[in-house]
Amino acid sequence: MRKRYTRRGSYRKASKKQRRARQAGKARQIQLLLDPDEMVAMLQDSVTDFATEVGLKVARLLLDDEVEQRCGSRYERVAERTVTRYGRQRGMVVIAGQKLPIERPRVRYTQRCGEAELENYARLQSPEAMPQAVLKRLVRGVSCRDYEGVVDLAREGFGVNKSSVSRSFVKASAKEVRQLAERRFDGIRFPVIYIDGVQYAGETMICALGITEDGQKRLLGVRQGATENAAVCTALLEDLCGRGLDTSSPTLLVLDGAKALHAAAKRVWGRNALIQRCQVHKKRNVQEHLPQKHWPELSRQLAAAYHATDYQEALKGLKTTARWLERLNPDAAASLREGMEETLTVVRLGVPELLRRTLATTNPIESAFSVAENVTSRVKRWRDGDMRKRWCTAGLLRAESKFRRVKGYRHMPQLLRALDRLVLGKGLDDNRKIA
């Protein structure tokens, strides 16, 4: 028989039937690598907009495979089977927060009346999938009214109106509020805790953010109140204690200078509370009493004091600045003297410069608040207090998902040694830097 040869480099184009068989083989390989639960989880969380069609194909593969496992191959005679194929019907699955149409297979019982439910189809219609995906999109900047516009295949799919999206967001965000309120902190030491408040439509949200021994930032809790008062702050801190927060070890509490926060921290931590007043807030408070022409000189003098490595030298610099302010405006001098020593706590502890910049201000928690404010900026009407807390928590948790370790985290052991000296009663040498 004569052999057939082809020229080097030439090829024969595969037929449509061969291409379909090849694609089916690849799809089958995907199915063998992942079990149904893993594939459903991948669809609900990891399919991006450009891969929606791929997600639908995998969904069809899941459904067809379940039918084949339960009914056997098409036209195969299986005496012991309990269900049989019953055609197809238009249905819906939720993939990455989108309601998408699909021609789903149907099966029915052979020994009794009624249609059998496909487990994979029920999982792909999970009610938990839509709220979580809606929550992620809303906190990224998609409003309830515009949500339909970003859903792929909306022209072919099922209706997604602002009411259903809003209900999904309420459900998902309420779940996140509960999870945050139930976080446990047993066995975790937070040597540094930031406490601050922010206004949301006439209500105040008090937030606590902790830094672990290895420099990781974690959101601790949120409490809502009419104002930033001591009762609300104390309630937040006592709630954290009830969830395992350790108050028996010295803790550096970074505050913005509000007397209510100061009083609550002292009440809960007692002698273990070491207060660091935010240097940025102190500077702004003093500037409010001065004409703008004096602001550059004030900034220069405060920077020189706050960047000093010796506590006594830094304190002397602030006292010199206070005397200079006395000649300009006595109220400005009084503002600087109020809590002046507490703005130098990190200097007194001998914290290295890189970590000191992180601990000297409330910038870490202010940054989280800025993300939350960006998320809530699209809200046109605040209906109730629960809505404020849900939106604020959603924004703060989005900020937490992007947290990185604080700058200077390698110096955290030095800070821990300095704080622990207070427990032993040895105190700190104001002129000594912790090694």
Model-derived features: where do they sit?
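RNase H-like nuclease fold core
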Residues: 2-13, 36, 75-76, 83-88, ...
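Acidic/histidine-rich catalytic cores and adjacent linkers
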Residues: 2-42, 54, 60, 64-68, ...
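Key DNA-contact positions within bacterial/archaeal DNA-binding proteins
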Residues: 61, 145, 163
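Residues in the recognition helix of alpha-helical DNA-binding motifs
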Residues: 66, 150, 168
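Metal-dependent DNA phosphodiester-chemistry modules and their immediately adjacent helices/loops
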Residues: 102, 286-323
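Short, amphipathic alpha-helical "recognition" segments used to contact nucleic acids or chromatin
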Residues: 129-141
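Short, charged amphipathic recognition helices of the HTH superfamily
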Residues: 141-151
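Inter-helix linker motif
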Residues: 271-288
